[in-house]
């Protein structure tokens, strides 16, 4: 990576205090969802404040497979960055504190009517209309919704689906309880992002698996490691959590979604105002059948992500693979693959910077295990304290 200039939006050294945004160059999109003729909205630059990655439904996912008719879905979601204009914001941004919602159905087979929709009880419009047709495979963005929200605020999104929708793209578990009508759900259907005015900050996207998604941390506590990083980033970059449980970097899976290489364009490059990619995948390539036992293949996949991210002028932070002794599929042979991958990553030639998750989480008495106070109980997934250790290592 020597000689390659990247926009670094996270300052400092590993374990140090994070710096602010460096520079003002952005690679985001303008508000394509703005009401026609609304020049003010069209000039706003947006940044992803909350995001999730979608998968296709399987036979085990009854709601996503059957879809909905005459149903209201409700979600309470934690934003990383708010809409409150910072000191020195331009007049346009000060005049238009707002959010924008993004919906997508990449795995759908038929058009879906979405709406009416509200955000914190305020109507969400689409080109001035109360609903929108979301074509199969398409993405739509809403008009700006005027809301003043601090960093770390919760946004309540209510979405009516007249249906019948047919099967829907969704995220299986966002570790926050919403509702389908009068019953609870941890799944989010169709909604993929919540954007806020960029106000000089860029987005950190985390491409990960169940550890990033939040398995091992309590629901509704917002203590996943990207959440805890976002809390440290106040008035700095926004954080988009693109973790999918079971996800790999190499292989696609019917239940656990397209692998990191396959979903890179849609999930990562689809984010507005992106500046940095954190890639934290690999443990499922090793431990999940069919196990990848050649470290070179995993490293090659990482290299491909780096090449593609650099093509879009993104800084890339790569994570070592954490310990998993005690997990149901642990073997010493698989752990050697993990250590071989980590040894190459620590040489510092692959990524722009390294997030040493392994060093942050391992038991000093047995490097193959999680520290006891970081173990959620299954040997693989860190608890909230372990998630904090990852956040502090960035």
What are these regions, as identified by a protein language model?
Residues 287, 322-394:
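Catalytic His-Asp segment of secreted/periplasmic serine-dependent ester chemistry enzymes
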Residues 6, 10-13, 19, 28-207, ...:
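N-terminal secretory targeting modules
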Residues 302-310:
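Surface-exposed amphipathic alpha-helices with a cationic face
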Residues 1-4:
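Actinobacteria-biased recognition of intrinsically disordered, low-complexity terminal regions
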Residues 137-152, 264-270, 284-286, 324:
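Extracellular glycan-modifying ectodomains
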Residues 50, 193, 202-206, 211-303, ...:
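Conserved SGNH/GDSL esterase-like catalytic core that processes O-acyl groups on lipids
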